[in-house]
C-alpha cells in the first residue's frame, strides 16, 4: 500500500465480508495480535463447503502504532465474561461472527507498507510456516519476477502461432485458467485437514482440493495427462485419500477444502482415474483406485443409484434429473470396465460392461430421444424435448442429453436410425431456434452462449460437435468446431459463453484449437476437429515434442483436406494418445470446401 500524504495511515482487515456476502456465512472468526508486525487468526464459514476453516498469518513491513476492532453481529448467544475488557482498542484478541479490525500506522509521503499473507487448513502455526518458508524476504520485485517465471514455465508448455492476436490471447488465457484448479491443499510440511476433519500428512505427493469433477473430467484432466501427468497423478492420489477419509467411503463428487458438497451428478472421479490409467499415467495405487471406483459405483443411497442397479435406469418419480443420471452412470461404468479389463479383473469388467449399456433403457424409439422413465417401467407422459427444469435433466435438455453416450457413439448412431439420419438430427441441433423461455431461469447462460439449441456453456454438449466424425460427416465437425471457437471465446470480461467451471471451458478451447478432443476420457483416442492455430509445439514432460502444423490456414479454410502423422497419411479422424506422447509431427492440410 502506498500512502500519498504525510499522515496517519489505516489498513482495515475485514473478516465479515465474502464473495456472496450472505448473512450467517460466518460461523466464527478470530484474530490475535502477536506483536506490532504480526497477526494471526482464522475464519470459519459454512456454505459451498459447509465447514471450512481458513487459518491465516499476516505480517507487515512496518510496525503499526495502535489497532482496534468491532464485532458487528446483531446477536451473540453467549458473551462470556469478556465484557469486563474494552476490546475495541488495543486488546490482543478479537472474536465474533461479524468482525472487522483496523491497524494505524505513521507514514511519510509515498511510504509503502507491504503485507505478506500465509494461509493453512491446519493451524495458524502452519500458516506462519508457509509464509516464512515461501516468502522469507520483503523483496516485492523478486516475488514478481519469480511469479512471472513460474507462469511462463506453465504457459510455454504449449507454444503456438495464430492468424489473429485475439486467438493467441484466448489460448494463453485458457492455459492460465487450467492452472487455477484443482488447488494445492497442504502446508509446506505436508500437513492438511482431511475429510474426516483430522490432520494428515501428504507423503510423496502434493495434496489437492477443488474437484469440480462433473465439469473437469471431460477435458481438463485429459489435458493434464499430456502436459502435467505428475500433477494429475497427485490429484488422483488426493482423490484416493478422500475415499479413505470419507464417512461414506466414496470418491469425491465435488469436493472442496475437506468437504464433500455433493454438487452435480455422476461419479466422475472414476473417469479421471480411468483416463490416466489407460494413458499410462499410473503413479498412484491402482488396486486402491479400482477398489474405490467399484465401491463408489455400488453406493445404493447415492442419487437414485440403487434403482439404477436394480432396474437399469433411474426412475424420474424416485430421483430427479433421472435421464442425466442414467446416462452419466452408464459412461462412468464403462470407465470402470476399462480399468478392470486392464487389470485382468474379469468379474468387475463383466459387471460394469453390462451396466454401461443402460443408456439404452431411457431411449424412446417412438420419439427418437432419451426420455424419463417411471418406476413402473413406462415413459413419463409429460415430455418436452427442450425443457430442462424438472424434466429429467440437469444443465441440459433431451436434445442435448440424447447425444450423451460418449463411450459408444457408433451404437448411439445406430440406435437413432443410422449415420445419415443421425447427421441430419445432429445438424438440426445447431440450426434450430431455442426460445428464450427455456433458459431464462438458467444461471450463467444467455443467448450469447447458444448456437441454435447447442449450449456451449453447459458441459454435456462439449463432445457433441465431434460426433459428426462417427457419422462419416467430418466436414460438419470441422465447420461447427471452428464456429464455436470463434463465437464462444473472446478476450474480454464477458468472453466466455458460460462459467469456466474450474478450467473445463478453457480446456475445451485448448484441445479444439490444437485440432483434436477427447470425446470419451478413459479411451486412448482423440477425435479430429478443425485446428485454429497456424502451428503449435507441445513440450512433453518426457522431453519429447509434439508439433502441429497447418497448411493453407485461414479464416475461410476451416475444412481438413488431408492429415499426415510423421509424414504418413492419417487414415480417418482419430488420433491416438501414444501418437502425441511419443513426439512427432501432425500436419493438417486445410481448404475452404
Predicted regions and their residues:
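Active-site core of glycosidic bond-cleaving carbohydrate-active enzymes
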Residues: 203-228, 266, 270, 280-532, ...
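Carboxylate/His-rich catalytic cores and anion/metal-binding grooves
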Residues: 161-188, 226-239, 261-295, 360
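Secretory-pathway/luminal and periplasmic proteins that interact with or process carbohydrate-rich
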Residues: 20-23, 180-186, 244-250, 301-302, ...
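Beta-rich accessory regions
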Residues: 7-8, 12, 34-35, 109-112, ...
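Beta-sandwich/jelly-roll carbohydrate-recognition scaffolds of carbohydrate-active enzymes
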Residues: 2-208, 241, 498
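A conserved hydrophobic secondary-structure block that centers on an alpha-helix together
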Residues: 6-10, 20, 161, 206-210, ...
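Aromatic/His-enriched, Gly/Pro-containing loop or helix-boundary segments
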Residues: 201-208, 249-267
Amino acid at each position: 500500500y502506498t500512502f500519498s500524504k504525510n499522515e496517519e495511515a489505516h489498513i482495515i482487515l475485514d473478516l465479515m465480508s465474502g464473495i456472496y456476502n450472505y448473512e450467517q456465512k460466518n460461523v466464527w472468526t478470530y484474530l490475535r495480535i502477536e506483536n506490532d508486525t504480526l497477526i494471526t487468526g482464522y475464519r470459519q464459514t459454512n456454505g459451498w463447503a459447509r465447514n471450512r476453516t481458513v487459518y491465516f498469518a499476516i505480517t507487515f513491513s512496518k510496525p503499526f502504532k495502535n489497532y482496534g476492532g468491532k464485532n458487528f453481529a446483531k446477536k451473540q448467544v453467549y458473551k462470556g465474561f469478556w465484557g469486563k475488557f474494552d476490546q475495541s482498542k488495543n486488546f490482543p484478541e478479537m472474536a465474533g461472527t461479524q468482525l472487522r479490525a483496523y491497524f494505524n500506522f505513521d507514514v511519510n509521503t509515498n511510504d509503502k507498507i507491504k503485507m505478506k499473507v500465509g494461509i493453512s487448513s491446519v493451524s495458524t502455526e502452519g500458516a506462519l510456516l508457509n509464509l516464512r518458508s515461501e516468502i522469507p524476504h520483503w523483496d516485492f520485485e523478486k516475488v514478481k519476477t519469480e511469479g512471472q517465471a513460474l507462469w511462463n514455465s506453465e504457459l510455454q508448455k504449449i507454444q503456438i502461432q495464430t492468424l489473429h492476436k485475439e486467438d493467441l490471447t484466448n489460448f494463453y488465457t485458457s492455459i492460465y485458467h487450467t492452472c487455477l484448479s484443482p488447488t494445492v491443499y497442504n502446508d509446506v510440511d505436508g500437513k492438511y485437514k482431511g475429510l474426516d476433519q483430522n490432520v494428515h500428512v501428504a507423503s510423496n505427493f502434493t495434496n489437492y482440493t477443488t474437484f469440480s469433477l462433473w465439469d473437469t473430467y471431460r477435458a481438463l484432466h485429459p489435458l493434464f495427462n499430456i502436459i502435467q501427468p505428475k500433477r494429475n497423478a497427485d490429484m488422483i492420489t488426493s482423490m484416493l485419500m478422500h475415499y479413505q477419509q470419507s464417512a461414506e467411503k466414496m470418491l469425491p463428487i465435488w469436493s472442496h477444502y475437506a468437504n464433500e458438497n455433493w454438487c452435480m451428478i455422476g461419479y466422475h472421479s472414476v473417469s479421471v482415474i480411468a483416463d490416466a490409467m489407460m494413458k499410462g499415467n499410473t503413479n498412484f495405487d491402482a488396486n486402491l483406485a479400482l477398489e474405490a471406483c467399484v465401491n463408489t459405483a455400488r453406493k445404493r443411497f447415492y442419487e437414485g443409484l440403487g434403482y439404477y442397479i436394480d432396474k437399469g435406469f433411474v426412475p424420474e418419480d424416485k430421483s430427479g434429473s433421472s435421464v442425466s443420471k442414467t446416462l452419466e452412470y452408464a459412461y462412468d461404468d464403462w470407465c470402470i470396465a476399462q480399468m478392470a479389463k486392464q487389470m485382468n479383473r474379469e468379474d468387475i469388467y463383466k459387471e460394469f460392461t453390462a451396466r454401461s449399456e443402460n443408456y439404452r433403457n431411457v431411449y424412446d424409439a417412438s420419439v427418437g430421444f432419451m426420455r424419463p422413465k417411471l418406476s413402473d417401467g413406462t415413459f413419463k407422459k409429460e415430455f418436452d424435448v427442450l425443457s430442462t427444469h424438472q424434466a429429467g435433466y440437469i444443465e441440459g435438455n433431451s436434445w442435448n442429453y440424447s447425444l450423451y453416450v460418449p463411450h459408444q457413439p457408433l451404437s448411439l448412431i445406430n440406435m437413432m436410425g443410422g449415420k445419415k439420419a443421425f447427421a441430419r438430427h445432429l445438424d438440426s441441433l445447431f440450426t434450430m431456434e431455442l426460445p428464450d423461455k427455456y433458459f431464462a431461469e438458467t444461471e450463467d447462460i444467455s443467448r450469447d452462449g447458444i448456437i441454435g439449441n447447442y449450449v456451449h456453456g453447459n458441459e454435456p454438449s462439449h463432445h457433441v460437435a465431434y460426433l459428426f466424425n462417427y457419422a462419416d460427416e467430418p466436414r460438419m465437425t470441422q465447420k461447427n468446431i471452428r464456429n464455436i471457437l470463434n463465437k464462444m471465446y473472446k478476450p474480454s470480461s464477458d468472453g466466455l459463453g458460460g462459467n469456466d467451471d474450474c478450467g473445463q471451458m478453457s480446456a475445451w478451447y485448448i484441445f479444439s484449437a490444437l485440432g483434436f478432443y477427447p470425446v470419451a476420457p478413459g479411451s486412448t483416442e482423440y477425435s479430429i476437429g478443425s485446428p485454429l492455430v497456424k502451428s503449435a509445439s507441445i513440450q512433453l514432460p518426457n522431453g519429447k515434442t509434439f508439433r502441429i502444423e497447418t497448411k493453407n490456414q485461414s479464416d475461410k479454410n476451416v475444412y481438413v483436406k488431408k492429415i499426415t502423422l510423421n509424414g504418413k497419411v492419417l487414415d480417418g479422424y482419430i488420433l491416438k494418445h501414444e501418437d502425441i506422447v511419443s513426439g512427432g509431427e501432425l500436419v493438417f492440410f486445410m481448404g475452404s470446401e
